[in-house]
Amino acid sequence: VQTCALPISDLQISMTIAKKPDFARVLEIVGEIPFTVLTLAGCGMIIRFRNRNSMVKKQGALIGGGILFSLFAAMGGFMTWNYLSRNLGEISKIWILILGVIMAAVAIWITMQIPEKNRKKALRFAAVALVYFVLVLILMNCLKTVWGRMRFREMTDPFNEFTRWYQICGRGGFDDRYASFPSGHSMNSAGVILMILLPDFIPALKDKRKVLRVCTYVWCVVVGISRVFMGAHFASDVTVGILLSFALFDLTSTILYKRKGEKESAELD
């Protein structure tokens, strides 16, 4: 209902609040970090809890998990550096390494909070995190390319250049100026919902699922609103982005947890 109503006020909202305040700049820089760190932690779990009964599987998990861990750390460092440069001016590229190492360290710390007895649950989380991240990345970029909705901050004549969220304006390829729909930051910020799975296998978070869920929703709303303040997206872009990300999480976790549960039941039989 909200999404259908937003086209009426989409442009007016952006024209009123898209002033790029400092808090919105900060959230542009850090908004996607939690999702990256949680996915990094999933890679760390693959490495730590790899199969030790088969040399092939053991080495495969070590190499594959190590490559993924390095790629996600590098990507997280680069993306954060890019947003820092965009908001603070060009900064040294050494920060790509520094930021990537910091994210990797936090991910490793999360991984080390898991007792050995929860190995299977941790690997299940890793599978969900990786598949979910990839699906978000693919769907986000495909929709941005196909929709071609112009960002508010790129408009010189908003009243004539504005299009509603449901209008497809393909531009013949991806162009960041026309990548307003859906909001990538919103889809990635919603990835923090992976936190609600952590209490299953991290003892320190036992009985904290409701708190983590509330934190997830608050984070999504705050980051989403900041994107409108930055003029990067319209309110409808943010709303659809969050909903799509949550839908992908529900789909991924439901399928993988159900499949894993059926496999474990068969093993018990």
Regions found by a protein language model. Name each.
Residues I33-R48, I98-I110, A190-L194, I242-K258:
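Hydrophobic cores of alpha-helical transmembrane segments in multi-pass inner/ER membrane proteins
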Residues R164-D269:
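Membrane-embedded catalytic cores of phosphoryl/pyrophosphoryl-handling enzymes
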Residues R48-G60, N87-L88, I114-R124, F201-K208:
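Membrane-interface helix-boundary motifs at transmembrane edges
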Residues Q2-L6:
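Short, small-residue-biased leader/transition segments that mark boundaries at the very start
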Residues L11-M15, F49-N51, A73-N87, P115, ...:
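Juxtamembrane "helix-exit" motif on the non-cytosolic side of transmembrane helices
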Residues K57-L62, T111-T145, R213:
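Interfacial segments of alpha-helical transmembrane regions
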Residues P21-G44, G89-L97:
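Interfacial helix-start motif at the membrane-water boundary
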Residues G148-F174:
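Membrane-interface interhelical connector segments
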